[in-house]
């Protein structure tokens, strides 16, 4: 970002949020490539020729000439002016990456200043950015709550909604018009945002730009909760949390009155939704709103969200996107876990003089279980097993060295163990480890044209050590396996505060 700052200071127009001139600067696209912001995207090409910065420079020059740009966008059946029809999508991707870099520039000073301010107040604030920090929050709060709203955030059916979100921050109309033109003329724009299981799925080739726009779309509606709940400490959104400061937001409060058609008194709206025990958590396209209140209050929140999305964002959301559930009777499907609050009975015997009686004390406990079926489906998609969970050999890795094969399988196994270490029941996790271990053994046996039994007999314990996590190795050296303390540590949940994101298992190669 320092290199961007040095070049941008040459042009004072950006200080007034005029980013339009930067679109025609070729060094922006060079940075997007050289700094590895999305190298896999820029190098992804169906043809034999690799990425060419010269072709991008020619494309930028053509953008000055509107007639040539329109011809290039509209005449998809003819040869483009590069003479490489099959590479058109590649250079649309490059322009998309350049746009992503440019639209992020006006927000970088705000983001940096906000993070610097937070570091002065909160020590080790990086732990709060871990997605695993959500589950200790659940353990601490959910035991005292009653109801939960499971919300699937509606995706924008029109890209214009995403562009309009930027207009409050970027005052340069020219850059927004060009961004809008680029989105509309993109040949495969219908595949950029696809409804799939009621969540926004972004194309991998254009993930940076459209994920940026979508996060702003979500962040804008989340800022309403900051005002309504008046408890910003409970709002632990893991994405763009530093951008929740909205100077322009208070000028739009009058629009909230229109959300509720049955009243014109804004104070009445706040009173209807006031809840001192309201907690909100979001990860990607799913959010959870938990409360200690009554079912009537949860229905009010549900009604508010439906009307707010429709009136303020022009988004229609079907009723099935929000579910009201009781925590004591329902499990939350969130971030790969089934989370629930269950009651454990603790029986205490009490004796008074000659009479004795038993006291049954119910104790609430937060329970997390691994969703084994989707996880096995991911392993099957990555060709580690079949759809029934039977391990198979990874044939595409048979050309690698034995050490590389074992390292890849071991890394995937350790990463899964690392992420799902917070599970209350380890049986499902042991099954996943078994699938990966046997798949690795079959891959090595296939490479050496041997049997799995003979291969395991030759390697012995050295093969199994590749699949141990660092924590398991340390515990095995300190404590014996048959001790009660060791068994408690192995079975107990662990939550790690260094997990920032989740990668696709099929692409972990």
From Swiss-Prot:
Keywords for this protein: Chloroplast, mRNA processing, Plastid, RNA-binding, tRNA processing
GO biological process terms held by the UniProt record: mRNA processing; RNA splicing; tRNA processing
GO cellular component, one term: chloroplast
Molecular function GO labels: RNA binding
Transmembrane segments: none
Compartments where located: Plastid, Chloroplast
Family: Belongs to the intron maturase 2 family. MatK subfamily.
Pfam family for this entry, one: Intron_maturas2
Taxonomy, superkingdom: Eukaryota
Function (record text): Usually encoded in the trnK tRNA gene intron. Probably assists in splicing its own and other chloroplast group II introns.
Primary location group: plastid
InterPro entries hit by this protein: Domain_X, Maturase_MatK, Maturase_MatK_N
Protein name: Maturase K
